[in-house]
Swiss-Prot record:
HAMAP family: MenG_UbiE_methyltr. Keywords: Menaquinone biosynthesis, Methyltransferase, S-adenosyl-L-methionine, Transferase. GO terms for molecular function: demethylmenaquinone methyltransferase activity. NCBIfam families: MenG_MenH_UbiE (TIGR01934), PRK00216.1-5 (NF001244). Its EC number is 2.1.1.163. Pathway: Quinol/quinone metabolism; menaquinone biosynthesis; menaquinol from 1,4-dihydroxy-2-naphthoate: step 2/2. This is Demethylmenaquinone methyltransferase. Belongs to the class I-like SAM-binding methyltransferase superfamily. MenG/UbiE family. GO terms for biological process: menaquinone biosynthetic process; methylation. The lineage of its organism: Bacteria, Bacillati, Bacillota, Clostridia, Eubacteriales. It catalyses: a 2-demethylmenaquinol + S-adenosyl-L-methionine = a menaquinol + S-adenosyl-L-homocysteine + H(+). S-adenosyl-L-methionine binds at T66, D87, N115, A116.
Amino acid sequence: MAPGYQPPSPEEKEQYVRELFDKIAENYDAMNQVMSAGQWEKWHREFVAQTHFRPGDHILDVACGTGDLTLLDAAQVAPDGKVIGVDISEGMLEVGRRRVAASPYKDLITLQLGNAMDLPFPDNTFDGVTMGWAMRNVASIPRTLSEIYRVLKPGGRFICLEASKPFSRFIRFGFFVYWKTFLPLIDWFVVKAGRQAKVRPYTYLSRSLDNYPFPDQLEELFREAGFVETDYQLLMLGTVAIHVGTKRREG
């Protein structure tokens, strides 16, 4: 464990994650390009291939952050669809609103505060739900999946893009060495969050896979939440995964 670092407890996690992303919001997109070794857009193209959204669909982007997936969703449902993005970080939403305002999809997108574990929408509202790079950060994966299932229309599709634990012990070891060595350095040299800082964003992110399920275990959690037609695709030697599931159709 990084010297002096204490991960947040489940009870503290929501507030910790909110403060963390408020702190890194302005540099978030640039740092993702660096940490992904330039693979960011490629992974997002793979994500788009899994969505199957259509013009006119109403889509929810959970933990939308600065709006990467939100904008990709909007491009698929244009010209008359709608996309709502929710996030617990006002800092991330502020960056996202600037990006949306400069995009051709500004009239299709609404960004608002919202919690993945308590979504402020009625049952059976959305044709599709997306979530990118956030499932590791929720306090309860089962509760989050249950909420997403609830707000999907029957037959609606959920697509989750996330970092992943490789099945291979050799690859997993190398990946964790990279994450747990390189990411904490960003706190020191970019975020200026030293050893005594309460919130150390990239040190936290370097530990966020420690207790995260393997891809097959996450797929099982999808099924336990009610999803059918579940599947996952592994990218980058299994260090990134796209999980999909469909809400059971009525009848």
